Curated annotation (Swiss-Prot):
InterPro entries: Ald_DH/histidinol_DH, Ald_DH_C, Ald_DH_N, Aldehyde_DH_dom, G-glutamylP_reductase_CS, Glu-5-SA_DH, GPR_dom
Function according to Swiss-Prot or TrEMBL: Catalyzes the NADPH-dependent reduction of L-glutamate 5-phosphate into L-glutamate 5-semialdehyde and phosphate. The product spontaneously undergoes cyclization to form 1-pyrroline-5-carboxylate.
Record's protein name: Gamma-glutamyl phosphate reductase
NCBIfam families: PRK00197.1, proA
Entry-linked PANTHER family: DELTA-1-PYRROLINE-5-CARBOXYLATE SYNTHASE (PTHR11063:SF8), GLUTAMATE SEMIALDEHYDE DEHYDROGENASE (PTHR11063)
EC identifiers of the protein: 1.2.1.41
Localization in the cell: Cytoplasm
Family: Belongs to the gamma-glutamyl phosphate reductase family.
Pathway(s) where this gene product acts: Amino-acid biosynthesis; L-proline biosynthesis; L-glutamate 5-semialdehyde from L-glutamate: step 2/2
Enzyme class: oxidoreductase
Lineage: Bacteria, Pseudomonadati, Pseudomonadota, Gammaproteobacteria, Pseudomonadales
Gene this protein is translated from: proA
One of the protein's GO biological processes: L-proline biosynthetic process
One Gene Ontology MF term: NADP binding
A matching Pfam family: Aldedh
């Protein structure tokens, strides 16, 4: 690359801005045609995708990448199938662009409503997983946004191969190539440039480790849609149904350990702890979950429960480790969650309607649940189709970010020669 990284990124930004204006007025059928053509291109390019991915895997092994990172990097046949199906699924989702709602007449006689419109240009910064290239590109395309994708250097060949399939889909639908651009330099300065171009980029969505997201949040000159941690809680109320409590608390922790919506701390009302914790602890022990608890929990469950420290309450383990605290009541549970939680997803297990309502009202999280596992906090499970990420911020998008989260609204006003007096 002969041009500087800054010049290169500025060129991508200019091209994306121009493409975004064309995408904003593209018909739904045209966008869907691009998505379906890209899916067909992926299907036809399986050998090419596998070859490119093997280059990345070989480099990763040579560079000492951890097994978990190599697993995330791998494009297995099943994952290619999922990417193809993901593109086709997004094509079936309702197009939010152009929808007008809340139309009303005001005393002056004019009619006012809100129209849903694209954000413009979305920058996506992510690590390892090549499938994110498809998730992000498909959602941005369907919502009328141009996107600049900066994947991890460890996945550069895989991302470039995927991008070629997307470009083929765009070309077949008559959409600009710059609607979806993959950053082709592995120079880390590209990230700094991407997050510092408010004239070209309207929002950044980082997906990766906490260090990456903290850096982007600190340095970005454009808005960021993000979440830092997934410190999720389940609170078992004194009025909980025991079978529901055990089933939900088991699933919330052990269904998968790595996702950001996995429970990390279990809170239990003192009035039900002796009935619910021993059978739950037996399940956790059988599944190899390390338990850490406060003094009351250790007294009840035995010395093999490690002492929970202040740091444990603030930790997202992403591992078979669970912190447990016995609390005096609902108020103490809410206080704990709002003090130590990450405003991601928290659940109460109770048959008491008033307690459920209070929990919903007072827990300050993006998703708050009653008698359901925190593992449901996901765009697909919420009926949004694919998601571009989960936001714990309070402005613009909160919770799983699907198509609607990648849009904004503008006021539209209709009159008949009306003038203000």
């Amino acid at each position: 690359m002969t041009e500087s990284v800054l010049d290169y990124m500025s060129r991508l930004g200019r091209d994306a801005r121009a493409a975004s204006r064309l995408l904003a007025r593209a018909a739904t059928a045209q966008k869907n045609r691009a998505l379906l053509a890209a899916a067909d291109a992926l299907d036809a390019a399986r050998a090419e995708l596998s070859h490119a991915n093997e280059q990345d895997l070989a480099a990763g092994r040579a560079n000492g990448l951890e097994p978990a990172m190599l697993d995330r990097l791998a494009l297995t046949p099943a994952r290619i199938d999922d990417m193809i199906e993901g593109l086709r699924q997004v094509a079936t989702l309702p197009d939010p662009i152009g929808e007008i709602r809340d139309m009303r007449y005001v005393p002056s006689g004019i009619q006012i409503g809100k129209m849903r419109v694209p954000l413009g240009v979305v920058g996506i910064i992510y690590e390892s997983r090549p499938n994110v290239t498809i998730d992000a590109a498909s959602l941005c395309l369907k919502s009328g946004n141009a996107t600049i994708l900066r994947g991890g250097s460890e996945a550069i060949h895989s991302n470039q191969a995927i991008a070629r399939c997307i470009q083929q889909g765009l070309a077949e639908a008559g959409l600009p190539a710059a609607a979806v651009q993959v950053v082709e330099t592995t120079d880390r300065a590209a990230v700094g440039a991407l997050i510092s171009m408010p004239e070209y980029v309207d929002v950044i969505v980082p997906r990766g480790g906490k260090g990456l997201i903290e850096r982007i949040s600190r340095e970005a000159r454009v808005p960021v849609i993000k979440h830092l941690d997934g410190i999720c809680h389940v609170y078992i109320d004194v009025a909980a149904d025991l079978d529901k409590a055990i089933r939900v608390a088991d699933n919330a922790k052990t269904q998968r350990y790595a996702p950001c919506n996995t429970m990390e701390t279990l809170l239990v009302h003192a009035g039900i702890a002796e009935r619910v914790l021993p059978p739950l602890a037996a399940i956790y022990r059988e599944k190899g979950v390390e338990l850490r608890g406060d003094a009351a929990t250790r007294a009840l469950l035995g010395a093999d429960v490690l002492e929970a420290t202040e740091e444990d309450w603030r930790t997202e383990y992403n591992a078979p480790i669970l912190s447990i605290r016995i609390v005096d009541g609902l108020g103490a549970a809410i206080e704990h969650i709002n003090t130590y939680g990450s405003q991601h997803t928290d659940a109460i297990i109770t048959e008491n309607f008033s307690d459920a309502r209070r929990f919903l009202a007072e827990v300050d999280s993006a998703s708050v649940m009653v008698n359901a596992s925190t593992r449901f906090a996901d765009g697909f499970e919420y009926g949004l189709g694919a998601e571009i990420g989960i936001s714990t911020d309070k402005l613009h998008a909160r919770g799983p970010v699907g198509l609607e989260g990648l849009t904004s609204e503008k006021y539209v006003v209709f009159g008949d020669g009306h003038v203000r007096t």
